[in-house]
Amino acid sequence: MILLIIEVREVSREEKLRTIISTIDNSEYSNNKDNNIQHNCKMKTFKDPQETWLSSTFSKMKYADYKPFQFVDGEGVRCSIYLSGCLFACKECFNESIQNFNAGSPYTMELEDKIIEDLGNSYVQGLTLLGGEPFLNTQVAIQLVERVRKEFGDKKDIWVYSGYTYEQLLKSSEDKKKLLSLCDVLVDGPFMIFLK
């Protein structure tokens, strides 16, 4: 008789994502010149996040939607803004229609004033930035978040949903680092339907 002992341990979300991300075939975005090979990867990746995907290059300073008084984009009642444009192109993305940087409407001071007014309600816990990719729209995101901090200090929390990982953002451009430093919660990493 053989006794098999299996150690069971909890795996953190970060460990799961690292394992999953390391098994994704990203070769179609590498220097592979063989176009006859079929690839399953739908997520675009990059070698140097600081020098390739810059907000100043891609952002059109547009937003796709603003939804006040939401319950699904973080804890408590939230005001959520969906910024236009994303280069990750995650497979089965919920917001595929706003991956285009030209989607939606120009961000205006009138919209910003409305967001600040809505956040002023005592029952609203905070602001959520989604997309698209907020870190590819830092001109808009930083302006809005700095205004929220000026008006409310730390009384309203700020959440950001991003296809970037925390580690990538730490090595990224200065504008991305600044936005990261202004936020309270980062929900990071590419969207993967099987983790839902």
Give the location of each predicted region:
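N-terminal [4Fe-4S]-dependent radical SAM core
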Residues: 2-8, 17-22, 41-82, 95-101
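Acidic, Ala/Val/Gly-enriched low-complexity intrinsically disordered segments
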Residues: 7-15, 25-28, 34
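Low-complexity, intrinsically disordered or signal/transmembrane-proximal segments
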Residues: 29, 38-39
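Conserved Radical SAM active-site core
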Residues: 53-64, 77, 95-160, 164-176
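Flexible, glycine-rich phosphate/dinucleotide-binding loops
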Residues: 72, 167, 195
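Cysteine-centered iron-sulfur cluster-binding motifs in ferredoxin-type domains/subunits
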Residues: 78-93, 133
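Classical nucleotidyltransferase
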Residues: 183-196
